[in-house]
Amino acid sequence: MDTDEQGAPGRKPLDRPQTPDELKFYARNYVMLALLAMILFLPFGILAIYFSIQTNEANKCSNWEDAYRNSSRTMWFNMLAIVAFVGIIYILVLVL
């Protein structure tokens, strides 16, 4: 394996700069929301950060299907972390 390669094993970085049309297709990575999710509920937050990084790598390689799939997964784990945090707080308030 070449040491100059970046990203996941199945992805090859582009050997040219991305065109403005390609840049329009960038999937959102929700990195700030993923950081908040990591603070609120660590297990789902870590997964959200992981898929956010995968989204960035897929965007850089113009692999739009993977980018949008990982972006969706990032958002789901962000929402799960927030719901889990609210649920834990709700249970703690009911018990105490």
UniProtKB/Swiss-Prot annotation:
Expression sites by tissue: Specifically expressed in testis.
Keyword annotations from UniProtKB, A to Z: Membrane, Transmembrane, Transmembrane helix
Record keyword Protein biosynthesis present: no
Transmembrane segments: 31-51, 76-96
UniProt record, GO biological process: binding of sperm to zona pellucida; single fertilization
InterPro entries found in the cross-reference section: CD225/Dispanin_fam (IPR007593)
Signal peptide bounds: none
Location(s) in or outside the cell: Membrane
Disruption phenotype: Mice lacking Pmis2 are viable but display male infertility despite a normal mating behavior. The ability of spermatozoa to migrate through the uterotubal junction is impaired. Their binding to the zona pelucida of eggs is also altered.
Any Gene Ontology CC annotation: membrane
Membrane disposition: Multi-pass membrane protein
Principal localisation: membrane
Family under the similarity heading: Belongs to the CD225/Dispanin family.
Function statement: May play a role in spermatozoa mobility.
Name of protein: Transmembrane protein PMIS2
Organism: Mus musculus (Mouse)
